[in-house]
Amino acid sequence: MPDIIPYDRRAAVRYAHRWAFSRNPLFYDFEEIGGDCTNFASQCLYAGTGIMNFTPTYGWYYINPENRAPAWTGVEFFYDFLTRKERTPGPIGVLANMSMLLPGDFVQLRLTKEIFSHTPIIVDIDGPPTLDNILIAAHSYDSDYRPLSTYDFQEIRFLHIIGAYKPENRPIFQ
């Protein structure tokens, strides 16, 4: 069974502040082809865990724009990967209520479509957790320290990050 390593929330939030209004050149900007929000969320999450899962289709990884997992850039796939039951390498999270949230956790919003379509990262909670006090950073549209209450959404869900499953070190010969 893989070990769980802690999530470095401060590293994830620092990354969010650093790149909220610009783009890290190591990653493609998906703004013009569906939006960059979950790509940015994944970058922040990776900054806090340092672990990717290179399983084709069902993993969570980015090598280049043509070689990435659907969970790296897709809102629903991101949710499905984080809340998976399998103990495979990579970040893990749970569906949470507002009282469980901490900086470094994620919000997913269903704006006007039938599906969730936006994934900001929580960068600060200014007092008791309310929509006014939860401050986020995001791409598509770029923002930092934006109150969650400023979004017009149909539905909201929260993802609390627990840590990450560490890849198992297996001997080559058994």
What is the predicted function of each stretch?
Residues 1-73:
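N-terminal capping segments
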Residues 21, 45-46, 112, 125, ...:
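Residue-level marker of positions within ordered structural domains that often coincide
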Residues 50, 77, 90-100, 141, ...:
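Mature, Sec-exported extracytoplasmic domains of Gram-positive
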Residues 54-57, 119, 148:
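Short, solvent-exposed loop/turn and secondary-structure capping segments
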Residues 62-136:
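...with weaker cross-activation on analogous glycine-rich loops/strands in unrelated enzymes
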Residues 121-174:
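Glycine-rich, aromatic-bearing surface loops/beta-hairpins
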